Amino acid sequence: MKRTNYAGNITEEYLNQTITVKGWVAKRRNLGGLIFIDLRDREGIVQIVVNPETAATEVAEAADKARNEFVLEVTGKVVERASKNDKIKTGGIEIEATAIEILSTSKTTPFEIKDDVEVLDDTRLKYRYLDLRRPEMLKNITMRHATTRSIREYLDGAGFIDVETPFLNKSTPEGARDYLVPSRVNKGEFYALPQSPQLMKQLLMTAGLDRYYQIVKCFRDEDLRGDRQPEFTQVDLETSFLGEEEIQELTEELIAKVMKDVKGIDVTLPFPRMNYDDAMNFYGSDKPDTRFELLLTDLSALAKTVDFKVFQEAEVVKAIVVKGAADKYSRKSIDKLTEQAKQNGAKGLAWVKFEKGEFAGGISKFLAESTDSFVNELKLTDNDLVLFVADSLDVANSALGALRLTIGKQQGLIDFRKFNFLWVIDWPMFEWSDEEERYMSAHHPFTLPTKETQAFLSADGHRKDSDLKKVRAHAYDIVLNGYELGGGSLRINSRDLQEEMLSALGFKLEDANEQFGFLLEALDYGFPPHGGLALGLDRFVMLLAGKDNIREVIAFPKNNKASDPMTQAPSIVADKQLEELSIKLANKDQ
């Protein structure tokens, strides 16, 4: 029989009609001679009722055999439900079955198919096809679809052209580790899966497409966490002849449409702007969560007047004030905060409580003579807790920024109903890497430096590392609730400037030509001013769905070991396959 509608869509409009629905048994109950079956599909649940005394024999037998997760086809008459269930859309009706066909049986599932189920993450991933049956997961996946549909509608209407770029690319440095793909035809050579379509989309601008977009898979071999996966999806944009503000305005309109279409929320435009230095100095993060205050305060000048060696020897002394919460933090809980500060690079965490007009605990004895000065500077009131980090500027910001987020959650300062969008602008072009022991591009090597600071890139033999700190970028990140939602920039469209940039990053001219020769050559052929942005689709949908891990909005994600418990990927391959690729494994037996 042809399905009349989804089970979850059968409402009072079908009263007294004979219909057919198909789906999975969510629950079966035998109560007082009547058999009730909750039939589930992607749209919801409808109640089926069978009276074995009046139903046809084959209907009663099928209802008696049915068990959870059996797949049924049910035909019957829609009648008004005596005991209504206002919690579901179909709660006003039920279907009196006149025919039931068992389309498929099911073993007992390894976990219940319901939302609030306690099960190990790897078990969920091993049986992901079952996990996706849960209403919450179905909702997440359909929300993802609604998001991409809204994005495409906006970009198509704004004159963007959807272009596919290649997955088999050249491996280039200046990023995370690549996933490499060996070439059988070109023995000993490798493709790299793209970390982004960055260079290809720039080439599309010199090709004259003017406005490009793509919702595209990208790949990065990096350490995983809740908002990272080895393969992820981004909304990739590039435009010609637009400035920073125009690209930002276009992005805001795109996001506003998604918020309205998917969440029914009207967001206020334009989004606030905050320069990078303010984000770091006041929030301790380049992706500040602005849903709550708890700002960082620089106390360096005042702190160095105190007879406390730790303060006097530090580059900076910064603090956060936890208002009215001193009595909520025991020494043990402060010790936990200290450990977190150390994990973020700090040597330690100093603290005091302000109680009844005096400092108590922690380093209070060192501040006794300067109590009024600190009270005035920090605007302290009774029962405040003050946390200090004395260190380099970067470490103080990073450590207190992390504590700020922890305390915000502990104290219930965050309004989780809010969606606070923010642009972080005026970025430095370079950032120091302790691991590489050199300056690296804060975004990527193709970002356009500001005219005012381009001179510091000069490779005339006099450039110092310290000069690179002064170079600023036409770069902008969009932040949502403390997550980097996306990042973009204006790009370099001059070969000379691009070569200067690569030189500043340590590339010799011959190395630059070997790695990026195709781009450098293209810059000789009338490259228009251009810029763009990439939004993390997985992260965006995660935040829209109110989740804290992007696995919840990806159909078939990897676990924290970059493995798939369901397919057992990655896996060992046959020796013959390796031979065809001219690959020999080192330490194969280890």
Curated annotation (Swiss-Prot):
Its main location: cytoplasm. One of its GO terms (molecular function) is transferase activity. InterPro entries: Aa-tRNA-synt_II, aa-tRNA-synth_II, aa-tRNA-synth_II/BPL/LPL, Asp-tRNA-ligase_1, Asp-tRNA-ligase_1_N, Asp/Asn-tRNA-synth_IIb, AspRS_core, GAD-like_sf. Belongs to the class-II aminoacyl-tRNA synthetase family. Type 1 subfamily. It holds the Pfam family GAD. ATP binds at R220, D221, E222, Q229, E484, G536, L537, D538, R539. GO terms for biological process: aspartyl-tRNA aminoacylation. GO terms for cellular component: cytoplasm. Catalyzes the attachment of L-aspartate to tRNA(Asp) in a two-step reaction: L-aspartate is first activated by ATP to form Asp-AMP and then transferred to the acceptor end of tRNA(Asp). L-aspartate binds at E174, R220, H443, R491. The keyword Signal does not apply. Homodimer. This is Aspartate--tRNA ligase. The gene is aspS. It catalyses: tRNA(Asp) + L-aspartate + ATP = L-aspartyl-tRNA(Asp) + AMP + diphosphate. Its EC number is 6.1.1.12.
